[in-house]
Each structure stands twice: as structure tokens, then as C-alpha cells.
Amino acid sequence: MDVQYRPDQIEAQAQQYWDDNQSFKVTEDASKEKFYCLSMFPYPSGRLHMGHVRNYSIGDVVSRYQRMLGKNVLQPMGWDAFGLPAENAAIKNKVAPAKWTFENIDYMRGQLQRLGFGYDWGRELATCTPEYYRWEQWFFTKLYEKGLVYRKMSTVNWDPVDQTVLANEQVIDGRGWRSGALVEQKEIPQWFIKITDYADELLNDLDQLDGWPEQVKTMQRNWIGRSEGVELDFPIEGEESLRVYTTRPDTLMGVSYVAVAAGHPLAQKAAAANHEVADFIKECQNTKTAEADMATMEKKGIYTGLTATHPISGEAVPVWIANFVLMGYGTGAVMAVPAHDQRDFEFAQKYGLPINQVIEPANGEPIDLALEAFTGKGTLIHSGEFDGLSSAEAFNAIANWLSERSLGEKKVNYRLRDWGVSRQRYWGTPIPMVETEDGTLHPTPEDQLPVALPTDVEMDGVTSPIKADPEWAKTTFNGQPALRETDTFDTFMESSWYYARYCSPQSDTAMLDPAATNYWLPVDQYIGGIEHAILHLLYSRFFHKLLRDTGLVNCDEPFKQLLCQGMVLKDGAKMSKSKGNTVDPQQMIEEYGADTVRLFMMFAAPPEQSLEWNDAGVEGAFRFIKRLWRLVAEHVEAGNTGTLDVNALDDAGKALRRKTHETIQKVSDDYGRRNTFNTAIAAVMELINEVSKFDAATDNALAVKQEALEAAVLLLAPIIPHAGHSLWQALGHDEAVIDASWPSVDESALVKDSIELVVQVNGKVRAKLNVPANADKASVESLAMDEPNVKKFTEGKTVRKVIVVPGKLVNIVAN
């Protein structure tokens, strides 16, 4: 065995062995317990970054550990390959998005292989291939047939430079997040999937997800936003009644105005007759629309000239247009109670509208409505027949009053909106719908799928090539001329079901092969960043339930356990090209080897926490592997070891063996239960320290050292698999470490012959005492009293009491 650690050679040999033996190729095996470990697949941007390396290192460690436990482990990899960056790169580099994407995939695949990740590459998929997206198109047509898909006109944030629709969160200070252009509001027909039909199930099933971080579940609960309230009508003379939704019907008697969104039909009608209203609406359309911004932005409004009638009191209530009311939430109209809602309060103060208190604190505490709204619950006042009721009692009483008169009804509302899946981009999955000349919409027939995206295109940066080419859209439906939909799917569609396709990626007769899918699913461990807590993880859960209800999967949830790894930081900030603080994984691998990079990634922080990149830490990881290598080389050089005779061990041998099995016990818990790989590595480092100090002068001592080194190699094999491969062979094993079992704890090795006790006199430590582990209290007491330092501090005193706490301490009370 070469005494020098040469990572480039060692890693090439291990990877060659895995390739030759197809070590990570798996098939269904009913006789074995399965474990499906999945890390979120990357966008093929061109190069891996350290965030990828961390994510995939964690997944690989979990996968290799579970394999050593004897499980049938699936760990696949693929590419989330559609999306805007490919279009931008195509324009910049004058190359078709498909060519750019596949070149990036080839390069990044090589990087992943160089890191030694144990993927079943036979299952590799790229979402931009027709073999993949044809099934997404097929599934969409099935959802359409089931009534879960519809098209409607929808107001969108339109980026005039990028020529695309932006999500609310992509509008920053009224400008497109990427182009910086002023965003416009535009109405276009868009396709939606009815995620709201599943809102209750998506909410309730979060309670089943015991293996998910509480933070992620809370974020999803808030996003779904279930609320119970009342929907009621404010009549308007000569107009349709204005319908509003409120979660606080107890405050209804305090309404002093109603407010509608700029896009509300009443607002549009008012704008047609009043240019000031029209100008205000235009201004609203160019301000921030992300919900989070609503709380902090300046409240602005304009009076429409219309007056509504309060449904209970009959009083006149002015109708305003307000920039804080969103058309996308509720009915696009709100009843405003300035005394009991801070946003309504700020608006009322600005425009001199009445602030009518109708709730007082139940404890009678005074409130100052000149300063702020009182938003708590309490007892009703100034509310006619409802005076004296608590807020909870008034909720039902007012709801019933309205219901009896057909003026309102109780209603459950959701913050969640149906999923708009249309994108006006080229590089995405074509939406498989056609429109015949009579305006009827039809799903593309199955025998015409996939609707393939042309890949040999030139990008002009303005119009999608499939929109620019009128010939592409021309097709027939039942022999009649028809036009294809030229929008493409939101790329969250592809990532919402890829985990299921990995179970049978080669299937060309079905979206999912039932036997394979129901063997592997659900995913046992999913790993990815918390930035995906809402959209990707919610859409995947939704898609899974759609797959279940179409008979394609038989479980309710896609991911049993979720681990959200922390970011990789440098100089205290997230690595980014703009900050100039990135570290190229490729450079690190070439300098130190993949195992060192993996070891550093797993040692520097627990997986859920942010990791601070530290060159000295990488150097330290490299030194540790070299040290382990040298220890094994020296041990092998010392000659063959015989069989370990545990009964013939001296105290030093027993101590090393105890340390070995304590380490196995701790590391097994760190890997299996806690996911704290950093403390697992620290424990193995401690064991290696003990091994290096151990004097193996006899055959039996060499044998106990062999056991310790074997344990260290096995415990680190999931983290440094290449070095583990060579070291395991060097230690005399014919089987590869990839096929070795996880070491088991010998409980008898943990039993101590003697234990150390602290001896206190009057509560102060005066001695430490080694006693036989099985010594009785009387013996311990006698040994403690014989300690010279104890004698010194009890001399001339009367010993009143001796307290023996077994296995811990002796406390002598003397005065």
C-alpha cells in the first residue's frame, strides 16, 4: 500500500470500480426494504456551485449509509432543464437553447461523477426532452377532461422588455426583477389548474408529515391561508350589489366606507366617467403587487362617487378605490372598519373618513383610537341589537341575521389561488390544447402527443419562436383546421412530478409504471433548500394527489422526510458572482480531491445550518484524510493480524475497544436519527486520536487496532467513499466497502471494568477515584475516605454523612 495519499489516483480507481460493477444500478426487489433518497435536481446552468455540492453530498451520505444498513437504495439524478436562463443565454451567445442546455448537462454530469455521487445514471432524465414532457402533456389533457383545468382572462404583470408575465414576487418597486422595466398590467387568456379544489386536503395532510421541518409546514399553512368568515352584500342603487368577504363580522356595524381594487368592475365603470379615477387606476397598475408589500406601502385612494347601503343599519357608505385592495384576493372588495383594522385606520386618517368604535376590550382597558386601531376581540358596543355580545357570539349572530335575509352567508376562504400555468416563453413544454375556428377549446388527442417544441430555432429576444412562426400553430382537430396554444407551461410543472418518473424513466407506454412506482414511492428522504418551501413543495404535493386520483400512485404524499440544507456562505454572505465571493468546486476537487471537499462540507456545520466556507477548514479535512491513510498504511506494514481474543485484552486494549464501540454507537445515532454528520465525523476523529496513541505491541493489540481502523473506515465510507474503497481493501477485505454492512455495536465492549468517581468534601471536589465498576457502596465509601486529600480536609472534623451517587460521585459532609 502506498503510504502517500494520492486522491486523483484513488478516486479514479474507485469510480472505475463502481462503473464496471454498476454498483448503483437498482431494480425493484420485494425481498428488501427500499429507501428512496432524492436531492432536488439542478437547473443546468453550466457549472455546479458549492450549494449544489453541499446538497448532493448530504444526499449521497444518507444514501450510502442506508445501503450499508442492507436496504435497496434508489438515488437518481436529472435536470430541471426548461426555463428563462437558457433563452437569455441563447440570445447572448447566439446559440439555440436546446444546444446550450445539453452542452451544460454534459459538463455538469461530469462534475457530479467526479464527486463520486452514487447515482443510478440509467435513470437520468432531462425535463426538456419530448420523452419526458409528452407525459406531462398527456396528464394535463386528463386533468382537462376531469374539469380540473380551465382558461380565463387574467390580469397579469407584464414585463414589456422580457415580453413575459411576472409573478407578484418578481415585481420589485413596480419594475421587472430581471429587466428593470416598468411593469404593465395586461389581460390575457391563461390556463389554470384547480389547486383550490385540494386546499383543505393540502392543509390537513400537513399534519401527517412528521418528518418535515415545522417551519416549512407553517409556511405552507400560511400560504394556503384558510379562514372562516362571512360573505355579504352592500347594495348599490342602479348597480349590482357589492359583495365583500370578512373574517370579522363582529365589526360590521363599524363600517365607514367600502374599498374596491383598481381592477374591480365598479372601479372600471367609474374610470370611464371620470379621468381622475382613470389616472389613479393607471397609477395603481404600476405599483407593487406582491402581498408582502401591501402592509408597508403608502395607502392611496380615490372616491368613486358611488354610495353603498349598509346591509343592517341602512346607512349610506361611500365606495372608494384603494391601492391596498387586490383583485386576486377574495372578491376584490373589502368593508373598511377603521377603528378595528390598522390598514383601514391609516386610510381613514389620510382621507378624513369616520372612525367608529364598535368593539371594546373585554377587560375594560381604555384604548386611544386617535393613535391606532384596536384590532383585538372583545365586546360589541354601538351595534344596536348586537350590543353586549362577545366577538365570538356576534360572529354567529350577525352571520345568521344576514343569512336569514339572504344578504350574506358563512364562507370558508383561502388565500391560495388556482395555479396559473401559462407562460409566454419559448423554452418550456407546449401546452397541449387547440382551438378550432368556432372558438371551441380541445385537448390535443393522445395520438398527436407529444406536441414537440422545435429546437432548431433562432432567438431574437423579443418574440417566442413558436409565436413568431404562424405555421407552427397550424394543426387539425377531427379534420377541422385548428390552432395550437403557443404558451408553454410554468417550469414548476416539470419539477412537480419528476420524483415519480425516476421510478420508471424509460417507460414509453405509460406516464408511470405502476409496479415500480408503488414499490419506490413515497420518497423516503428529500433534500433541498428552504427557498422551495412553498411553491415547489406545495405544487409537488398537489401533483401527487392528482396522480393518486388518476390512479397512477397509491400513497397520499410524495416526500416522507424533508431536510432543508443551509446555504454556503463566504465572508458571511451567500456566495454569488456579483459579490465576487464564489469558490469553484472544480478547482477544489483538482487541488484536494472530491473526498476532502465532501468531508469539509459535512464537517463544517450541521446540514440545516448555514455553512461558512473556510480554506483552513478544507486544508484541515485534507490533513485528516492523509492522517487516516498513513495510520492504515503503517498498520498494514506491521503485518497480518490474528483473530481478536477479547478475553485476553489488557486495559489499554479494552479501552480502545470500548472507544471503538462507543464511536459506532454514537455515529449510528448521528447518521440514522439526528442527521448530524458533523458530530459523527468529530467522534471518528476522536477514535483516530486514540488509535494513533495506542501501542500495538502484540498480535492481539494489532487485532484490536485493526477493529478500530475498520470501524473508522466503515463509519466514514459514506462521506469519503473513494478513500474508504482503497482503505477497506488495504485492511484485507475482498468485498468492496460499497457492499459492506454498517458496523454493529458489541454491547459487552461498552462495559467498563472500573469507573472514575468525583469525591467532594462539603460540596468541593477534593479527589478523583477509580473504583471497580461493580463495587458496592460500602467499598466506595471506604476507598473515598482513604484518599490522602480527603483525609486532609476531614482531619479534626466529625464526618456527619457520606452520600454515594452510584457511577458519579461521593459527597462527604464533615464539620
UniProtKB/Swiss-Prot annotation:
Keyword Magnesium set for record: no
Compartments (UniProt record): Cytoplasm
Listed InterPro entries: aa-tRNA-synth_I_CS, aa-tRNA-synth_Ia, Leu-tRNA-ligase, Leu_tRNA-synth_edit, M/V/L/I-tRNA-synth_anticd-bd, Methionyl/Leucyl_tRNA_Synth, Rossmann-like_a/b/a_fold, tRNAsynth_Ia_anticodon-bd
Cellular component aspect of the GO annotation: cytosol
Example of a GO biological process term: leucyl-tRNA aminoacylation
One Pfam family per UniProt: tRNA-synt_1_2
Name under which the protein is recorded: Leucine--tRNA ligase
Organism whose genome encodes this protein: Alcanivorax borkumensis (strain ATCC 700651 / DSM 11573 / NCIMB 13689 / SK2)
Gene that this sequence comes from: leuS
